[in-house]
From Swiss-Prot:
UniProt xrefs under PANTHER family: HEMOGLOBINASE FAMILY MEMBER, LEGUMAIN
InterPro entries referenced in this protein's UniProt entry, alphabetically: AE, Legum_prodom, Legumain_prodom_sf, Peptidase_C13
Active-site residues, as the UniProt record annotates them: 180, 222 (nucleophile)
Disulfide bonds, paired cysteine numbers: 255-269, 433-463, 445-480
Pfam families noted in UniProt: Legum_prodom, Peptidase_C13
Keyword annotations of the record: Disulfide bond, Glycoprotein, Hydrolase, Protease, Signal, Thiol protease
Protein name per the record: Vacuolar-processing enzyme
Gene Ontology MF term list: cysteine-type endopeptidase activity
Coiled-coil region list: none
EC number: 3.4.22.-
Protein purpose: Asparagine-specific endopeptidase involved in the processing of vacuolar seed protein precursors into the mature forms.
Signal sequence, start to end: 1-31
Site positions per UniProt: Required for post-translational maturation and enzyme activity: 269
């Protein structure tokens, strides 16, 4: 009897304690799950915490435009980046009808692809190609079509699915581009290039038409900061980050022979440093909690190789800085599986080995050469391709220097050609002049190619120095007289402007 009374008293006492403690403001006590596991892992009896729904989440449509501006298996990484971005956005709830994809689509089924029909963007990554819509592929991946799509102008689109950003004043737009670039230009697999001022004018026109509420733009390319430096307005409700500043390269990563390395059967880089940084950040955080600013900071640290800038670049930002306070889900969507992920936590400070964007093509060709059978015709052909590519690079470099000597004299040429304007200044005063000088050069000396895009600042400086069209023609003819451009003649490659 006494034992029964004691047990009853003890039980009532425990219940009293539990009832009392549940009302005390003791941090972490009973109010928390006391989950000993990592964030994002729940016990079977637990339910995910409800996510607050913002008013903004009920208004407007999220749009995305994804652009891979290259072609060829050596540029595998650009299409891998874009396919990965598509999968991320779809998991975030963006509808296929609101995501428009530009990619040449010559990678997945390429004879050099060791995994036919599959594209990966990480050494241990899953296929990111499956389900990606073929909106604008092959010859339809052009700057002109991109402009028409952004403006929602169906009548101006040539080929492709015909999808355009038919957005309304309360909609949000996310634009992501990955490819080669140069001062003032972004590459396209079908020439001409995208020129900065043309692109900015399209953005201004979209804003003037009330075509969106806010826009976020991410750009992966060499010298990508030059696309916006000095010409990006702050009053058009657009926030931009770029993989590099106006003067430096961006970087390929997950490359053969480097760490982290792709699976051994791959001969090409799987991704780009800035691109994998933002996507892997988005996949590991709750985008209802993480802000645009937090992602910018994380990506900036990782792309700089953790502030060493040893084979890293300076991630830059332009446009309306107030957008940085917005939560990322407003542009990239929200994956319910990430509900208990942290809002942001830095990756381990593990520098990644990378290759300069402009050298990635040679790195790829060298991998093919090393893996070819000794003495085979294939090995000889690849070696000749490498020699031809290096020879054309050398020709471009020496021709530009000689043209400078002819225009300004040997003593002044280098200083003028390599001149860099003050931060905040546009690359060139007359963008029409820039295009004209590029066409004159390519007519005489051959196509710039992905490598030669680096000389765009030289052309800009020639324009800024007041050189006439006639003087440029005379200098180019003298510098490249007798040169046979062969496969790199603009009649084969097209003009870059």
């Amino acid at each position: 009897m006494e034992t029964h009374k004691s047990l009853l008293f003890f039980t009532n006492y425990v219940l009293f304690l539990v009832f009392t403690l549940s009302f005390l403001p003791i941090p972490g006590l009973l109010a928390s799950r006391l989950n000993p596991f990592e964030p994002g892992i729940l016990m079977p009896t637990e339910e995910a915490e409800p996510v607050q729904v913002d008013d903004d989440d009920q208004l407007g449509t999220r749009w995305a435009v994804l652009v891979a501006g290259s072609m060829g298996f050596g540029n595998y990484r650009h299409q891998a980046d874009v396919c990965h971005a598509y999968q991320l956005l779809r998991k975030g709830g963006l509808k296929e009808e609101n995501i428009i994809v530009f990619m040449y689509d010559d990678i997945a089924k390429n004879e050099l692809n060791p995994r036919p029909g599959v594209i990966i963007n990480h050494p241990q990554g899953e296929d990111v190609y499956a389900g990606v819509p073929k909106d604008y592929t092959g010859e339809h991946v052009t700057a002109k079509n991109l402009y028409a799509v952004l403006l929602g102008d169906k009548s101006a689109v040539q080929g492709g699915s015909g999808k355009v950003v038919d957005s309304k004043p309360n909609d949000r737009i996310f634009l992501y581009y990955s490819d080669h670039g140069g001062p003032g230009v972004l590459g396209m697999p079908n020439l001409p290039y995208l020129y900065a001022m043309d692109f900015i004018e399209v953005l201004k026109k979209k804003h003037a038409a009330g075509g969106y509420k806010k826009m976020v733009i991410y750009v992966e390319a060499c010298e990508s900061g030059s696309i916006f430096e000095g010409i990006m307005p702050k009053d058009v409700d657009i926030y931009v980050t770029t993989a590099s500043n106006a003067q430096e390269s961006s970087w390929g990563t997950y490359c053969p022979g480097m760490e982290p390395s792709p699976p051994p059967e791959f001969t090409t880089c799987l991704g780009d440093l800035y691109s994998v940084a933002w996507m892997e950040d988005s996949e590991s955080h709750n985008l209802k909690k993480e802000t645009v600013k937090q992602q910018y900071s994380s990506v900036k640290a990782r792309t700089s190789n953790y502030n060493t800038y040893a084979a890293g670049s300076h991630v830059m930002q332009y446009g309306n800085q107030s957008i940085k306070a917005d939560k990322l889900y407003l542009f990239q969507g929200f994956d319910p599986a990430s509900v208990n992920f942290p809002p942001n936590n830095a990756h381990l400070n593990a520098p990644m080995e990378v290759v300069n964007q402009r050298d990635a093509e040679l790195h790829f060709m060298w991998q093919l050469y090393k893996r070819s059978e000794n003495g085979s015709e294939k090995k000889k052909e690849i070696l000749q391709q490498i020699k031809d590519a290096i020879k054309h690079r050398s020709h471009l470099d020496s021709s530009m220097q000689l043209i400078g000597d002819l225009l300004f004299g040997p003593k002044k040429a280098s200083a003028i050609l390599k001149s860099v304007r003050e931060p905040g200044s546009p690359l060139v005063d007359d963008w029409g002049c820039l295009k004209s000088m590029v066409r004159v050069f390519e007519t005489c000396c051959g196509s710039l190619t992905q490598y030669g895009m680096k000389h765009m600042r030289t052309f800009a400086n020639i324009c800024n120095a007041g050189v006439s069209h006639t003087s440029m023609e005379e200098a180019c003819n003298a510098a490249c007289s007798g040169h046979d451009a062969g496969q790199w003649h603009p009649t084969n490659q097209g003009y870059s402007a």
